Amino acid sequence: MVAAPTSPAELKLGVDCVIADINLADFGRKELDIAETEMPGLMALREKYGSEKPLKGARIAGSLHMTIQTAVLIETLVELGAEVRWASCNIFSTQDHAAAAIAAKGIPVFAVKGETLEEYWDYTHSILEWGDGGSPNMILDDGGDATGLVMLGSKAEQDITVLDNPGNEEETFLFASIKKKLAQDPTFYSRTKAQIQGVTEETTTGVARLYKMQKSGELPFPAINVNDSVTKSKFDNLYGCRESLVDSIKRATDVMVAGKQALVIGYGDVGKGSAQSLRGLGATVCIAEVDPICALQAAMEGYRVVRLEDVVEDMDIFVTATGNYQVIRNEHLVKMKDEAIVCNIGHFDNEIDVASLKEYEWENIKPQVDHITLPSGNRIILLAEGRLVNLGCATGHPSFVMSNSFTNQVLAQIELFTKGDEYAKEVYVLPKHLDEMVARLHLGRIGANLTELSKDQADYINVPVEGPYKPDHYRY
């Protein structure tokens, strides 16, 4: 591993790392030290597995938001024996001091807050390129971009026409990046794919991509769906968004949320947390949903369930949380009231039709906050250019809830790296006993004391005294 650079001038793509400023490393380290006190799951795994080094020999290509919390994850993986190369999975989500702290430890990282799309795909390629000419053997993904890059590149080796018709700006840069790499190394992607033993996926959108590949028979390696671990989806997605959404809106706009009319589009775990977040500060919250079960849940929680087109002229705040495409379209945007706030807390930037807004007048207020003048003369406030608002305009989810998610990630990486031969080329979830273990590791930090079953009680409900306590189909 190449020594960490000592000045920004030494930060060259493909050498060791690309970060904004190595001088931020001390600041990043101080925040890392605080975060570790709030991440008991990861610290427990270091203590449990640190001497065993179960990830020795693992070469992990990581594509996940380069935050302080992710830095604790990275250092945990390294302490357990892995070699790691890291890029952010979003152009706005990097915390530059976190990236600097990781670079200062000599760990290759390629992430800058506000990087261009061209740079984004260059950096994602960099995590697949080991200095000795080798390849990663594991992928840790968030949104599926690293996995998708390997897969699409492999297809393009066989048929370059798959890159002929990009459907949006992101694909334009992705396709160009793949073409550039193929010109340099025509078999790069297939060689990389052949070395991958498994992938662990963090988020709903990336998991959907994996299941799509499994259904079509194209999944070339086993995958673990970390997102659907209960201690991820019911905590990170729900409680994380409950805190981070309003944090990002307040930091970006300084508006008073109380008294505002807010529409949350999508009432899954992320939408539930987002709705609670806005209601908690006094907003009147409505929900838009396509799923009758989620819609009924929202109604039973006291939210008014509406259609976007029926309320678009009345809402002060719009939040998309669907993981879907073109949810808020131009036909909705042009009808919005003056100073309406529009943001997205789903993984990708295509929930809001930002491309259609490019024809209007934009005024940048500050990073990731734009005023856009509509044909009506009204101006809307677009946050993070329609990308993840909680990481574009704030610092994402708190350390404690991310410890839940990242403890699952480490366990999933250990599982696939050490037992990969036992898994078929399918998508799996972590077993219930590991889910419960993750929860146990976090109880003490918040002063929670667990009641214990007696042997007779356990026998009565037909579960082991030590768990697992619920069947796999149980809905928490």
Curated annotation (Swiss-Prot):
InterPro entries: Adenosylhomocyst_ase-like_sf, Adenosylhomocysteinase-like, Ado_hCys_hydrolase_NAD-bd, NAD(P)-bd_dom_sf, S-Ado-L-homoCys_hydrolase_CS. SUPFAM superfamilies: Formate/glycerate dehydrogenase catalytic domain-like, NAD(P)-binding Rossmann-fold domains. It is found in: Cytoplasm. GO terms for cellular component: cytosol. Pathway: Amino-acid biosynthesis; L-homocysteine biosynthesis; L-homocysteine from S-adenosyl-L-homocysteine: step 1/1. One of its GO terms (biological process) is one-carbon metabolic process. Keywords: Cytoplasm, Hydrolase, NAD, One-carbon metabolism. It catalyses: S-adenosyl-L-homocysteine + H2O = L-homocysteine + adenosine. Belongs to the adenosylhomocysteinase family. This is Adenosylhomocysteinase. The lineage of its organism: Bacteria, Bacillati, Cyanobacteriota, Cyanophyceae, Synechococcales.
